[in-house]
């Protein structure tokens, strides 16, 4: 009743039109200036997401300037009148640094996920940026360098190259013919005036939809929105581009790739999100992606390394992708022929009715899972309103429910015409082995110290003046079954679903006999073949009957409507404890793994990682073991079964259950499903041993498909996951390379435009630690960027961080702990990680107190004691640095 009264009262504060809904948790309003607002109350966590959707993207850009909308998105982070760049970055960092933007075809999104108490600040930022943005020539010249690094990064991806060519052919003559990324030549011609014109034309309240989800007071929130946005004037919008899709012609694309396996692909044009046939296309896509379908079966029968199907939907059209993998040197023509045969059958004979029914039911059930994440819920509402031009995420439910097998088959016949297909073959190629570097020079004086103290706008100062411990709203129950299996339960009532994740703590490089490397990978692939009581198709049909998603292996998961939780857990346990492991399936999976490894061990990514690990760890370290075609070819089914028996133990397993379930019911169901599982013998040690300091070195791994270098500076550190100093290291790493306001980002991107992104991280294990800094840049900028990295690390050792930096980093770390509760998935994975490390489930509260008490001297001392600026291994993947 209180929610209803509150909803009715909102009509008094909108100053514009108000539309009631049947859901008391959903509030809608349209301000007088045309801004549409949707507020969805979600009490999952003390967290809120704001998504500002501007109904303009790469569709609306001028001819010849495909990246204009993308560039404007970048410049929105360079500041606005009344909100400087430094202020914006400081605010974003203070709120937890969970902010970003995304440019799509017809929509550009700006989103914040923040603790609830920071909602007002997030709204102030959005309103300020709608009013105007700073787009001076000097700022654009700097940001152009960063965005061109992003272009280089994506153009280094063979998949992106494929998508670019595909779109050019599939959507010729329409705005969809190009991606929104942009090109270097077009950015070289783009001026700051061009960008300002785009912003001033399209960034208007009557061309925007603001979605707010989280634990908020709808009435107070809407009042804030009106106060901040209500006086922004509406604008007269230009005509939007039209879409006149021409009949597709069959085309073939051939590309080299640095992927470890080859890919044969087929693509067709699908209906879009706003088309009448969208629901049918969605069900068709899900049916063809079914684990009971012939495409998925390709990866289980030996006809391909894998078979996948996906539908990618834009407002006015979609793309259907069918992919099949083949080993390096394999017969791509044969794989392609098998792939084509599947879709010829779908076009002429239709899709099996039972797969259509299961796909339809699963699509309806999946709507409920969108409620299990605060930012995910905002995305769902944004997609429904801004992309699909619908009323809510649920308004597609009736359309999906009405889809019939006959409609699906009619669409399949129309879509999968071979004369309309685009075919692609991505063939793995060698780029050469890693080679030692000659050292890196560079100007020592380039750049400068990070920005000094930033004075925040008055409307933001109070929010960050005082540090507060985060509100941790989770209250898990934990129990251990008689067989040693740990179960953690976090009840949540925001949806009628339950999500389960679990892990068996294993390590094949410590547990598998020498010469059997890869046994764990073959074992995990065999969980797709059903159980000892149900074959593969029967097992998947049982999951489909309860609209559940399940995976098994050393890591396992289940997502199921809460009414089917018991049955879902029974099926998960049956798969985990009684995998069928048929001999024929073993032979196929062994062959597939062998073929995949033949390409993997020659791929630039693998060679790069192998060489880096070899430079960090001593000879003979178990972390240097890896599977080879020979080690996998030598395995027997008995080897795999023995490894399973020895390593899959309940006393090495944790299960986390989050959702619409009580601890008592979860305990009862878990005991019934997993209680019969037994362990024999002493518990194994699955943790790598401690290692000494590494020696400094440099090397380059060639990658012929890359135009940009991926650079890692890494070294071993005398710290592990239980070291008392880890909190100082984490906080210091946050200041050094943890976000837009970090030293590295300021020096390498904001001031110099050398890189698109740069970050630092400390990866700690039970007995060893590793500190890394990663960035991507052009080959001629590697040395210059590295010089700045080393300088900034030394600065952390030589000079205490400022009070302002420490305060901001603490605020960010404290808020990030609150943001870790924003979804079922993040809650479950956090608890699973803590359990696997043997830490208490209230470790976040303990960490918060440690961060609150941290001093600049403690951070400086840890960096001085544990980091070695002259000890980094510099690993470059891509063209040789110049």
Predicted segments, located by residue:
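M16 family metallopeptidases and their MPP-like homologs
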Residues: 40, 45-71, 85-129, 159-185, ...
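Non-catalytic, conformational "gating/processing" segments within enzyme and secreted inhibitor domains
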Residues: 144, 164, 193-228, 420-421, ...
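Short, conserved secondary-structure transition motifs
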Residues: 148-154, 244-258, 361-370, 562, ...
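Proteolytic maturation boundary segments
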Residues: 12, 18-37, 217-256, 267, ...
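Extracytoplasmic/secreted cell-surface and envelope-processing proteins
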Residues: 85, 218-222, 276, 332-333, ...
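Conserved GTPase G-domain substructure that encodes guanine base recognition and part of the catalytic core
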Residues: 70, 284, 732
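Histidine-acidic residue clusters that define the catalytic metal-binding segment
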Residues: 20-29, 150, 168-208, 236-244, ...
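Gram-negative bacterial Sec-dependent N-terminal signal peptides
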Residues: 1-18
């Amino acid at each position: 009743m209180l929610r209803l009264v509150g909803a009715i009262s909102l009509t008094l504060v909108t100053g514009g039109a108000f539309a009631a809904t049947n859901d008391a948790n959903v509030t809608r309003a349209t301000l007088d200036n045309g801004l549409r607002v949707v507020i969805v109350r979600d009490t999952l966590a003390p967290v809120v997401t704001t998504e500002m959707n501007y109904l303009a993207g790469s569709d609306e850009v001028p001819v010849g300037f495909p990246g204009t909308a993308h560039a404007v998105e970048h410049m929105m982070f360079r500041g606005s009148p009344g909100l400087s760049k430094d202020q914006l970055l400081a605010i974003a960092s203070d709120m937890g640094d969970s902010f970003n933007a995304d440019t799509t075809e017809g929509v550009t999104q700006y989103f914040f996920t923040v603790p609830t108490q920071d909602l007002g600040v997030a709204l102030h930022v959005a309103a300020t940026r709608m009013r105007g943005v700073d787009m001076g020539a000097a700022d654009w010249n700097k940001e152009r360098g960063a965005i061109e690094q992003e272009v280089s990064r994506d153009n280094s991806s063979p998949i992106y190259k494929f998508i670019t060519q595909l779109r050019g052919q599939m959507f010729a003559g329409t705005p969809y013919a190009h991606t929104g990324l942009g090109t270097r030549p077009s950015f070289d011609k783009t001026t700051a005036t061009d960008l300002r014109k785009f912003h001033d034309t399209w960034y208007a309240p009557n061309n925007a939809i603001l979605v707010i989800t989280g634990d908020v007071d709808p009435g107070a929130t809407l009042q804030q929105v009106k106060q901040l946005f209500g006086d922004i004037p509406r604008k007269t919008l230009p005509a939007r581009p039209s879409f006149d899709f021409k009949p597709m012609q069959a085309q073939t694309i051939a590309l080299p790739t640095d992927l470890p396996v080859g890919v044969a692909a087929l693509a067709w044009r699908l209906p879009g999100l706003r088309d009448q046939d969208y629901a049918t296309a969605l069900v068709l896509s899900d049916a063809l992606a079914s684990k009971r379908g012939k495409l998925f079966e390709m990866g289980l029968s030996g006809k391909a390394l894998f078979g996948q199907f996906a539908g990618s939907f834009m407002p006015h059209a979609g793309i259907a992708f069918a992919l099949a993998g083949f080993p390096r040197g394999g017969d791509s023509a044969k794989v392609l022929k098998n792939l084509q045969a599947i879709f010829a059958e779908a076009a002429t004979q239709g899709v099996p009715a039972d797969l259509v029914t299961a796909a339809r039911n699963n699509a309806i059930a999946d709507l409920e899972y969108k409620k299990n994440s605060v930012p995910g819920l905002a995305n769902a509402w944004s997609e429904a309103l801004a992309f699909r031009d619908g009323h809510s995420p649920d308004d597609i439910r009736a359309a999906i429910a009405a889809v019939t097998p006959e409609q699906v088959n009619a669409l399949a016949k129309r879509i999968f015409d071979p004369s309309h297909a685009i075919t692609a073959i991505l063939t793995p190629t060698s780029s050469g082995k890693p080679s030692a570097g000659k050292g890196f020079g560079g100007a020592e004086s380039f750049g400068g110290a990070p920005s000094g103290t930033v004075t925040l706008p008055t409307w933001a100062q109070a929010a960050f003046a005082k540090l507060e411990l985060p509100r941790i709203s989770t209250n898990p129950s934990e129990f251990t079954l008689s067989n040693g299996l740990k179960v953690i339960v976090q009840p949540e009532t925001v949806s009628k679903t339950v999500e389960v994740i679990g892990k068996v703590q294993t390590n094949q490089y410590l547990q598998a006999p020498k010469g059997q490397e890869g046994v764990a990978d073959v074992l995990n692939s065999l969980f797709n073949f059903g159980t000892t009581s149900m074959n593969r198709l029967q097992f998947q049909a049982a999951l489909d009957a309860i609209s559940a998603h399940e995976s098994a292996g050393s890591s396992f998961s289940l997502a199921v409507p809460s009414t089917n939780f018991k049955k879902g857990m029974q099926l998960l346990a049956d798969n985990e404890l009684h995998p069928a492991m048929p001999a024929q399936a073993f032979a196929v999976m062994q062959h597939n793994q062998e073929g995949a490894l033949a390409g993997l061990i020659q791929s630039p990514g693998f060679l790069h990682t192998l060489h880096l690990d070899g430079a960090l760890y001593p000879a003979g370290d178990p972390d240097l073991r890896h599977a080879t075609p020979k080690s996998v070819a030598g395995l027997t089914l008995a080897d795999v079964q023995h490894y399973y028996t020895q390593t899959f133990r309940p006393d090495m397993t944790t299960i986390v259950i989050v959702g619409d379930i009580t601890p008592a019911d979860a305990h009862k169901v878990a005991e019934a499903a997993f209680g019969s599982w037994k362990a024999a013998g002493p518990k194994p040690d699955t943790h790598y041993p401690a290692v000494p300091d590494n020696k400094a070195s440099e090397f380059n791994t060639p990658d012929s498909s890359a135009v940009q270098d991926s650079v890692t500076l890494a070294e071993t550190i005398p710290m592990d996951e239980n070291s008392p100093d880890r909190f100082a290291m984490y906080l210091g790493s946050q200041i050094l390379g943890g976000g837009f306001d970090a030293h590295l980002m300021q020096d390498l991107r904001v001031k110099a435009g050398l890189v698109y992104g740069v970050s630092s991280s400390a990866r700690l294990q039970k007995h060893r630690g590793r500190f890394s800094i990663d960035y991507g840049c052009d080959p001629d900028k590697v040395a210059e960027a590295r010089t700045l990295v080393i300088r900034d690390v030394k600065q952390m050792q030589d000079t205490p961080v400022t009070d302002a930096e420490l305060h901001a980093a603490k605020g960010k770390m404290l808020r990030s702990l609150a943001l870790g509760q924003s979804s079922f998935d993040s809650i479950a994975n956090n608890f699973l990680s803590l359990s696997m490390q043997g830490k208490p489930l209230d470790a976040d509260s303990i960490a918060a107190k440690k961060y609150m008490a941290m001093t600049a001297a403690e951070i400086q001392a840890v960096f001085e004691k544990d980091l070695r600026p002259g000890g980094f291994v510099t690993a470059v993947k891509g063209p040789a640095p110049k």
